[in-house]
């Protein structure tokens, strides 16, 4: 086996021409499984590039010859496979489908799975997403405002030619491109959690499942709940918050929280968080010693990674630049 060194962003690439070794790599990154070579064993090779961000593992998997893969129940995870080229004959429990670049396969956590593919003489990589079961069910619970007791029953076919399907695929493909970057933004600690939640939320909207209809039943939050949410944003502004986290902590669904913010404040929870962070950054700038702290350090402390954009929005909000505020009041 050859293994590329960690690229500095948590991404690793594995290359193996040994069947047992390839099985061990896949089992370690994803799930215990069996691999049966249907094509020419003499040219067998497995290549995998993968990284985890929060509760999501995203990888590109390719074999040099046709194989068949079997797993038992995934138990602690849900899974999605998207062939970037060619076809993947696959099943989850009794359900069967042929996954293509236009149709992803979604796997339940409580069913056995099988895959058969990679017969093409050309590279046919598959985007493989492993999603932590608890994280996805918590995400759904936050949006519904009620606990998820039973496993989510997904339909196996996810149409990637619908509007939401294409948009979700674009998000996944964008993340997959970042696997090759040593400075992948999606794997930055302050970005990875919201990015993973965005991907999970998108899947819940794009895929067919037994809770999907309930996602479109808004129940407006009370102003008191909005107040609690604003207090929570104030107290945790330095953390990489998401709407789902805020909704969960104040006990309402994401949709209810969004409606409540729009009705009460005329904005969204995340825009309100940005305002709070901007105000806290200004407070730090006015109190800072320019000799020991700069605009960049303070901006990044409050989650503004693009300092130039921060400076522009700061001036638009307060009428002065961050550097002007940094020099305004002597260090106290």
From Swiss-Prot:
Q: Which residues bind DNA?
A: 244-265, 295-318
UniProt keywords (A-Z) are: DNA-binding, Transcription, Transcription regulation
Q: InterPro entries under this entry?
A: AraC-bd_2, AraC_XylS_family_regulators, Homeodomain-like_sf, HTH_AraC, HTH_AraC-typ_CS
UniProt-recorded Gene Ontology molecular function terms = DNA-binding transcription factor activity; sequence-specific DNA binding
Q: Which SMART domains match?
A: HTH_ARAC
> Matching Pfam families, A to Z?
AraC_binding_2, HTH_18
Q: Which SUPFAM superfamilies match?
A: Homeodomain-like
Task of the protein = Probably involved in the positive regulation of the thc operon for the degradation of the thiocarbamate herbicide EPTC.
Q: Know the name of this protein?
A: Probable thc operon regulatory protein
Origin organism of this chain? Answer: Rhodococcus erythropolis
Gene name of the encoded protein: thcR
